[in-house]
Amino acid sequence: KIIDELLQFVNERQWWIFSFEWNTFEEKYWLKIKPCFVRFRYLDNNLNSGFLWTKIDDISLIIDDFKNLDIKCNKVFIIENEINYLTFPKIKDSIVIWWKWFNISNLKNIDWLKKLEIYYWWDIDSHWFKILAQCRKYYSQTKSILMDMETYSYYKQYIVKWKIITDREFKNLTDYLDKKEYSLLEYLNKNNLRLEQENIDHEYVGKTSI
């Protein structure tokens, strides 16, 4: 805030800059914005064509470079927790993306993702069902995994309190969640509950993932 005030003072002749509402400090002063990175792993060694004469399993790319890829896979798993990302089981013709950001809109408009099976796994709570709905706006084929009442009930000892989403937000989700997902969302939101995905053990993941 102090730097912002100083820059406004220095640039007082350019008063029109400050008459707009800017999303970020960088946009306001035409500064370079820190790029968004996508981190992903190959779940099938046959997909890894190699980089600099060696095969690299865990890769991070800026979003624009990721958009230009053409990985010959059939399935993509999107996961929020890093440990689960690192320990996710090997699956034929698949990659897994670690997406720790709340804003999943940064993953939209990636042409090669549009033709693939996409599986979404986040915490079982109202917020992440909202993000699932948003993901389906961009990729309607997206399916949720390990975000069902069976998983929730199996790990009931790890259920904790959580914040709710508003009625207005609820109305915007009906077109993007199936009946079971929406029913679980209503239950979670009514009771202010959540189950974090890091509480789900690796053996259970291996048995139930695609």
Question: Which residues fall in each region the model found?
Answer:
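Nucleic-acid enzyme cleavage-core boundary/entry regions
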Residues: K1-E117, H127, Q134-K137, Q141-I145, ...
